[in-house]
Amino acid sequence: GLQLLQYSQADATFTGIEGQVRQRLTRNLGITLFGDTVRAKLNGGGLLPRIPATRAGVRLDANWQAWEGQVEWVQVARQNRVADFETATPGYGMLNLGVSYNGQFSSGTPWQVYLKANNLTDRLAYAHTSFIKTAAPLMGRNITLGVKVAF
């Protein structure tokens, strides 16, 4: 069976905060702390659906000549402040790595070759904001090799 939903407008209050701070550790090394959280309630009582879970992370980045790299840990909290017809979503942590090399064609056009590895812990994770979260979880361990050319 398909779920049938009917939406109507209602007054609601959203409160939240997001931020990030970056500290340069050396000429070629930096660290970034980031996070966000939001709460939403209907003014007449009740919770709103598909509100994202609280998220926090740390990223270490480095660069040397034309090379760049980063390692990142993102922690997403369990979302159990749910509307009547929703289910809670478990929290998860994700480890991501990336490295890239930047160059330029003789014409001056920039290019980049990159390698990204995401969700290296291969955690089963769900996006609470998705209508199909239980049918389509976030991608498991994955590696991407790509080329970018700006034109």
Predicted regions and their residues:
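Short, surface-exposed loop/helix-turn segments at secondary-structure junctions
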Residues: 83-89
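Transmembrane beta-barrel architecture of outer membranes
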Residues: 14-16, 51-57, 92-96, 132, ...
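C-terminal beta-signal and adjacent terminal beta-strands/loops
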Residues: 81, 101-151
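Outer-envelope beta-barrel architecture signal
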Residues: 27-29, 54-56, 65-67, 93-95, ...
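Gram-negative outer-membrane beta-barrel transporters
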Residues: 2-82
